[in-house]
């Protein structure tokens, strides 16, 4: 049995000039995940369910657990001293950590502390998403927004934690995707899936079909394609949609499938956030042999213009994403 800590240190040895700072940063995320895991498991017994009566910068009602997870992760990252600042779904602006250690830190972190938190009340899987970059401003001074507005192809590491029937941490540093299952009796994440890859073909599509009437024509046509009977392509495909990006992505990663959150009439730019949802998942997808785009362009090549920028998102098994892109190109949006 190999723990997450042992695995990270082992991989660090492949890089002679590694300083251990990224290892310490990942350790902070690991600690935050353990704390969130502990408290999610007793969410119905303590007063952390439901909303807190305020909205975030995107106008979405903030769940109590959203804010709780945000504070725990922020505290864990700040305490390690390897992070200069964070960007979070739950923060209106970037959070600049103060002090000499923070100003001399090399990294910034973007995160969705609790993806799918509206599912908590009904005991459905939720997750944490994180993305790590080297800062681009000079060491020795506070970070700026420019440090966070980098394209996804500059990510140093990315990953997610899925809190389900078991808690798993899945991450990449650009050398494959590896998954670790939490053993609560030992208090450690243990390697359970090394070098994870999407299956070459898939037969699941994950999309909220309740919004069908609002979808672009290309997405409507792709859904109909998925529903048609054709033995040569193993259709019709199966619909599986949980409503938590982490949970849907995780299932499709292991089983083969595509996740789509397109633009809609009410969200013409899409709804998922580029920096702390699409980019980290796209990095993981490509490292696992999959693909991620906005229906046309590679997600990791898109230059962000604002912290909470939204983006249509197509991610999963490479062949399925390419098929969906073909429908988007063939059937432009209805006028």
Curated annotation (Swiss-Prot):
Sites where the protein binds substrate: 115-118, 208, 241, 271
UniProt entry keywords in alphabetical sequence: Carbohydrate metabolism, Cytoplasm, Hydrolase, Magnesium, Metal-binding
Q: Name one GO molecular function term.
A: fructose 1,6-bisphosphate 1-phosphatase activity
Reactions accelerated catalytically:
beta-D-fructose 1,6-bisphosphate + H2O = beta-D-fructose 6-phosphate + phosphate
**Which annotated residues bind Mg(2+) 2?**
112, 115, 277
Q: Which Pfam families match?
A: FBPase, FBPase_C
Family assignment?
Belongs to the FBPase class 1 family.
- Protein known as: Fructose-1,6-bisphosphatase class 1
**Organism field:** Proteus mirabilis (strain HI4320)
């Amino acid at each position: 049995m190999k723990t997450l800590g042992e695995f990270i240190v082992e991989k660090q040895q492949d890089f002679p000039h590694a300083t251990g700072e990224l290892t310490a940063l990942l350790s902070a995320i690991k600690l935050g995940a353990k704390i969130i895991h502990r408290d999610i498991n007793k969410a119905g017994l303590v007063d952390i369910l439901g909303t807190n009566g305020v909205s975030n910068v995107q106008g979405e009602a903030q769940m109590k657990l959203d804010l709780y997870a945000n504070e725990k992760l922020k505290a864990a990252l700040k305490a390690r001293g390897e992070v200069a600042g964070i960007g979070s779904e739950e923060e209106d602006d970037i959070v600049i950590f103060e002090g000499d250690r923070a100003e001399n830190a090399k990294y910034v972190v973007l995160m969705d502390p609790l993806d799918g938190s509206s599912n908590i009340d009904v005991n459905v899987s939720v997750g944490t998403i994180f993305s790590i970059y080297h800062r681009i401003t000079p060491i020795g001074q506070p970070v700026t927004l420019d440090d966070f507005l980098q394209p996804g192809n500059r990510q140093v590491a990315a990953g997610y934690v899925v809190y389900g029937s078991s808690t798993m941490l899945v991450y990449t540093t650009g050398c494959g995707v590896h998954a670790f299952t939490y053993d609560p009796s030992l208090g450690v994440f243990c390697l359970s899936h090394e070098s994870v890859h999407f299956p070459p073909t898939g037969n699941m599509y994950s999309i909220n079909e309740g919004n069908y009437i609002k979808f672009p024509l290309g997405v409507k046509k792709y859904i109909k394609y998925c529903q048609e009977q054709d033995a040569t392509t193993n259709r019709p495909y199966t619909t599986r949609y949980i409503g938590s990006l982490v949970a849907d992505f995780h299932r499709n990663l292991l089983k083969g499938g595509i996740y789509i959150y397109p633009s809609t009439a009410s969200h013409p730019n899409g709804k998922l956030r580029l920096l702390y949802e699409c980019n980290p998942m796209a990095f993981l997808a490509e490292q696992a042999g999959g693909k991620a785009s906005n229906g046309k362009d590679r997600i990791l090549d898109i230059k962000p213009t604002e912290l909470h920028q939204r983006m249509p998102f197509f991610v999963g098994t490479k062949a399925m994403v390419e098929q969906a892109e073909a429908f988007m190109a063939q059937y432009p949006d209805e006028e």
